[in-house]
Amino acid sequence: MTDYIADYRTWLQEEKHASDNTLSSYLRDINQFKTWLLGAGSPDLRRVKKDTINEYMLYLSGAGKSPATITRCTASLKSFYAYMLGRGAVKTNPAKNIAALKVERKCPEILTSKEVELFLEQPKCVDEKGYRDHAMLELLYATGIRVSELIGLDMGDVNLAGGFIRCRSKTRERIIPLYRTAIKALRDYITDIRPRIISGPDEQALFVNMNGGRMSRQGFWKIIKYYQEKAEIDKDITPHTLRHSFAVHLLENGADIRSIQEMLGHADISSTQIYTHVIKKQLKDVYNKAHPRA
């Protein structure tokens, strides 16, 4: 029998140029759906009807999955069956008219400017790890890039003389400026520290672990959690927290939302507009606390 999921993976990679995160999420959703079908006694992906998918959505809801997870799963199935339809493996897309659940967009956790300053002060430039970690955290807050983009940076993506980095994806590229402190932190790391810890002269990764290979997501996550504990900041800090804080602090200081959208790499302005809601909420909180008649 044709392995439709393997073929779909190739299609996502080669035709749709899907990001690694999209690829991982979609394939995980499709494989979980296939497992559920097998348990329901109907393992053939070609014989799925709209009612089958509705039943699966009810199963996910009953299993305690969040609306966001169920909505993403719906999108995964729509994409998979659009591919199947294009191949002639099915006559209709059974997921096409499945309504997505309304997902409440929560305001992201934001650090204050003082909390950011405290957090960035935690790595001490007294050894190789301290210099590297200091450079990573400064760069993350200076640019607002995603953690996947941070660990994916190569040496050729950094222009210290010009004061910017080049952030690439499979379909686009963006240029993001750096402030002076971040430039200095990067220069110190690149000039004095990185040559000592890379695995060999052919290593292209900007940030490497202490074994000399490219930094992993898990490794960077542990670094974030380590410095959160040291800073004693009573907030759940993740790699994305600095990205959110970067956007809100720029807005607070007068940056226009289109420029922030470009720096964050958001395809849709609505993804960036959530940060304006954060600021409005902060203003309302200040008003309610400070106004004598509030």
Predicted feature residues:
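Conserved catalytic core of the tyrosine transesterase superfamily
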Residues: 1-294
